[in-house]
């Protein structure tokens, strides 16, 4: 497919001219296309609505991947955290960059077609309808509310009809015309001055735009939520609070805490969608402050650290499963939900920071099996009931040091696992680490709270052999280890699997790799400008398959603190957000 576009001029704005190319040939994206993506396209953040991170393309295979060559690369102008999850449609790559920038690139050549910049790009009706960044930006955030970590990271975007959707660092959802990059609408869902912001982008489910918010760590008279919106207008259709309020179902699980002191339960990773059941599945994060003793309750604290099944048209809660009731070490379970049918059972697979693989029934939320990988030292989990019990001495007390694996950075984080139907296996980026942690008190006042003071001393996992990075491969449904690959540097991207019997990942030390998905043999590697970081994808244009691997900086935990502490000999440039695209030679 040849990508057709024409050059036009958006006009003078802020004293400069903005050149814009318009996409001429563009097929509106439908619900059917999202459910069954055309071969070679990448229309959802993980390739399909089940969040597999899998490409059915096999032109690049385990037999020829060692011939991969760089076709083009593109660097972002903006500094900030880069964790891009690109989309591909009609030969165009739509990619989010730092600070709310979205660009459309010719996916075969890397040429820029258009660019959207918050507060600069005009709206489609020739007015500037963007929210005022001077009023809503970081400078307006009171120190007591500013959430800092991860702010400005836009992981994924969504595409539907003729619009691109993004959730912003200023607690807004934006719709951009996919042909021109012009702003169509912008809806603010919360007050960024209270610390609210987005890192997870939207998904589309049965014609509704759904996304969850973050920035809920500080005490305020409001809580975190997931919302559904009309994709044409941005109108909010429903809102589900991810913290149970006093007097509502589950409200007593926070004890006697007033609503303003019930913090956390952010939903900062995008969800999945089951079209037949018409349910979206979202994870939620931990309660805050992290430690029970600091937040003032030892209750379960619904709906923290849970998987939620919501009707995308109404926001009604169909079921929930709380993985870690009353969690007390910052062990998130917010991450991706992977939908797989195994042995006639329609299942969800997910893994949190503790490296426990949970298998749930998609219809009922019933636990099918919990499999502890054996890396963590904090708690015991019953594999059939899912009940957890904390090990002796592992419930934090204020001012008392505990020795725990993993650290608060976790074994698993936002770097999403991938599923391959060829091998019936999950490919999971893991970082092996432990921590000496001392939790301190915090004051229960508006604007206070947060994670709570924590003194942290990271150290290598005793069973890691000095390695920080691991690609863990589990057979499904047995959850037995199929193979694992370990190295000194952390694996720093999501995993990508393909029908060519391949799995791709990248690391903190600027390397990108391809492995034989069946055997674990390393078949190809290359090195790029800075740390590999983000969500790799694969696509096809004019019968040619491409592999796109993002690089970037910023973020927290694996991206900065752990390598600095545990692999000080490894270095990287402090900027260089970019995308690198590879293909076989002609």
Model-based region annotation:
Residues 430-432, 457, 462-521:
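Loop/turn-rich, solvent-exposed surfaces of beta-rich toroidal or solenoidal domains
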């Amino acid at each position: 497919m040849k990508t057709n576009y024409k050059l036009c001029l958006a006009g003078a704005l802020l004293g400069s001219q903005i050149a814009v190319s318009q996409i001429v040939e563009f097929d509106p994206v439908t619900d059917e296309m999202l459910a069954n993506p055309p071969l070679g396209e990448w229309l959802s953040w993980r390739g399909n609505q089940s969040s597999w991170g899998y490409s059915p393309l096999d032109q690049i295979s385990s037999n020829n991947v060692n011939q991969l060559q760089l076709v083009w690369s593109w660097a972002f102008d903006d500094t900030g955290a880069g964790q891009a999850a690109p989309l591909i449609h009609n030969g165009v790559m739509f990619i989010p960059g730092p600070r709310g920038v979205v660009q459309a690139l010719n996916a075969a050549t890397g040429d820029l077609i258009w660019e959207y910049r918050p507060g600069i790009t005009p709206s489609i009706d020739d007015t500037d309808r963007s929210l005022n960044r001077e009023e809503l930006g970081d400078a307006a955030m009171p120190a007591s509310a500013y959430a800092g970590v991860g702010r400005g990271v836009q992981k994924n975007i969504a595409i539907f009809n003729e619009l691109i959707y993004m959730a912003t660092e200023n607690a807004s959802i934006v719709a951009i015309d996919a042909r021109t990059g012009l702003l169509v609408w912008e809806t603010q869902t919360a007050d960024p001055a209270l610390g609210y912001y987005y890192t997870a982008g939207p998904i589309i489910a049965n014609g509704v735009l759904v996304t969850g918010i973050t920035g809920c760590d500080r005490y305020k008279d409001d809580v975190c939520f997931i919302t559904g919106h009309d994709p044409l207008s941005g109108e909010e259709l429903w809102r589900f609070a991810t913290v149970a309020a006093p007097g509502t179902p589950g409200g007593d699980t926070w004890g006697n805490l007033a609503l303003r002191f019930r913090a956390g339960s952010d939903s900062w990773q995008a969800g999945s969608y089951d079209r037949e059941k018409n349910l979206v599945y979202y994870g939620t994060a931990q309660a805050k402050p992290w430690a029970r003793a600091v937040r003032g309750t030892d209750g379960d604290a619904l709906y923290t650290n849970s998987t939620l099944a919501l009707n995308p048209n109404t926001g009604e809660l169909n079921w929930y499963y709380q993985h870690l009731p009353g969690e007390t070490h910052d062990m998130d379970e917010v991450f991706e939900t992977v939908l797989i049918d195994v042995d006639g059972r329609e299942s969800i697979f997910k893994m949190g920071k503790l490296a426990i693989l949970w298998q749930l029934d998609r219809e009922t939320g019933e636990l099918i099996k919990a499999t502890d990988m054996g890396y963590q030292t904090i708690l015991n989990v019953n594999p059939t009931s899912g009940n957890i019990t904390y090990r002796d001495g592992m419930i934090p007390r204020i001012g008392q040091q505990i020795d725990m694996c993993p650290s608060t950075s976790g074994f698993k984080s936002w770097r999403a696992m991938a599923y391959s139907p060829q091998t019936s296996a999950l490919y999971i980026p893991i970082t092996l680490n432990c921590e000496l942690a001392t939790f301190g008190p915090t004051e229960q006042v508006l604007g206070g709270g947060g994670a709570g003071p924590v003194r942290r001393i990271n150290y290598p996992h005793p069973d890691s052999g000095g390695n920080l990075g691991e690609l863990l491969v589990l057979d499904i449904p047995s959850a037995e280890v199929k193979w694992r690959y370990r190295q000194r540097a952390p694996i720093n991207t999501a995993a990508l699997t393909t029908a060519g019997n391949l799995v791709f990942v990248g690391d903190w030390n600027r390397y990108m790799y391809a492995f034989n998905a069946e055997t674990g043999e390393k078949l190809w590697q290359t090195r790029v400008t800075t740390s590999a970081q983000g969500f790799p994808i694969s696509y096809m244009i004019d019968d040619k398959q491409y592999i796109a691997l993002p690089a970037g900086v910023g973020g927290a935990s694996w991206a900065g603190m752990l390598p600095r502490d545990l692999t000080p000999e490894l270095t990287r440039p402090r900027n260089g957000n970019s995308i690198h695209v590879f293909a076989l030679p002609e």
